[in-house]
Amino acid sequence: MESTYIFGHKSPDTDAINSAIIMAEFEKLNGNDSAKAYRLGKVNPETQYALDYFKAEAPELLTEDLTDKDVILVDHNEFQQSADTIESAKIRHVVDHHRIANFHTAAPLYYRAEPLGCTATILYKMFKEQGFEIKPQIASLMLSAIISDSLLFKSPTCTEQDKAAAQALENIAGVDAQEYGLEMLKAGASTVDKSPVEIINADAKTFNMGDYSVRIGQVNTVDVNEILARQAELEQAITETLSGAEYDIFVLVATDILNSDSTILVLGKDKDKIAKAFDVELDNNTAFLPGVVSRKKQIVPPITAALS
């Protein structure tokens, strides 16, 4: 039987990694024994904390050419966020909770997208709909992804369905979501040991917006000043990234996970348009965005509107 490659987006976060593992389990329960989870980048500290805590193995790094291979995408659909050879692959299934853009297939496919806070919540629903048992380890991976994407249920993207799923999964996983979740988020929030390049690329996605290619990186922290203290070296890393890639604008979002606010650092072409998108002015290339924590719901839409 031909292998099925399952993976999330580049610069993977907890939802991208965990949902690939969960989807592979779902496929196997549906009789697809050739399904295997992969990742498109390094496992970040937050995700590694979750994997270690629940004794789960990280997926293998995908290095193969996907031409004519069967693939399933989770937690993304836009080609520029996916594997380099994705346009030559046979995309059989997508499970996602983001906008649909820069995506097409040559053949029909299963596509499930819902405006929920996390891909793992959709997968939870799929397990329930099929009557599949959700084992404790799978439950723990689902719960970790929901906590991550919702910033412990504080993000405006978090829905009642996400909260209900998390409550059910908390019981199966046998952990206290608040206590475990805060420790997991803290594990991924320290930037002291990270290089500037690691910080700007750890959770970065590329978006096509009008005539612009925009790179938006997000870093969670418990102290935004820890990030701003390194502004000069971060700007150098961003400038080098802009000069060496086809990006027009780079937006680094430093999100305070305790106070649910963000500070943006913006460099590139027409950067003032980014400030206008949020009705603020850049001061030394930065601006404070109170109450903004979600890239998907609070950052991408206004920037898209401003640049389109």
UniProtKB/Swiss-Prot annotation:
Mn(2+) 2 binds at residues 15, 75, 97, 149. Its cofactor is Mn(2+). Its EC number is 3.6.1.1. Its main location: cytoplasm. GO terms for cellular component: cytoplasm. It catalyses: diphosphate + H2O = 2 phosphate + H(+). GO terms for molecular function: inorganic diphosphate phosphatase activity; manganese ion binding. The keyword Hydrolase applies. Keywords: Cytoplasm, Hydrolase, Manganese, Metal-binding. The keyword Manganese applies. Belongs to the PPase class C family. This is Probable manganese-dependent inorganic pyrophosphatase. The lineage of its organism: Bacteria, Bacillati, Bacillota, Bacilli, Bacillales.
